Amino acid sequence: MTIEKIYPIFTVRWLAVHGLAVPTVFFLGSISAMQFIQR
């Protein structure tokens, strides 16, 4: 029963981390690519 309580919290935390990390990596990658293309 304890595992069932922890599992949804871990899933929500995993989704939140990836939901924030993916756009951040894409944002930083696009900025570095634009600066690299400008030079």
From Swiss-Prot:
Q: Where in the cell is it found?
A: Plastid, Chloroplast thylakoid membrane
Residues annotated to bind heme: 18
Q: Which Pfam families match?
A: Cytochrom_B559
Q: Which GO terms describe its cellular component?
A: chloroplast thylakoid membrane; photosystem II reaction center
TM segment ranges: 14-30
Q: Which GO terms describe its molecular function?
A: electron transfer activity; heme binding; iron ion binding
Query: What SUPFAM superfamilies is this protein classified in?
Result: Cytochrome b559 subunits
GO biological process terms, alphabetically, are: photosynthetic electron transport chain
Q: Report the sequence similarity comment from the record.
A: Belongs to the PsbE/PsbF family.
Q: Which NCBIfam families match?
A: cyt_b559_beta
Q: What does this protein do?
A: This b-type cytochrome is tightly associated with the reaction center of photosystem II (PSII). PSII is a light-driven water:plastoquinone oxidoreductase that uses light energy to abstract electrons from H(2)O, generating O(2) and a proton gradient subsequently used for ATP formation. It consists of a core antenna complex that captures photons, and an electron transfer chain that converts photonic excitation into a charge separation.
This protein is called what?
Cytochrome b559 subunit beta
- Organism this protein belongs to: Welwitschia mirabilis (Tree tumbo)
Name the gene behind this protein.
psbF
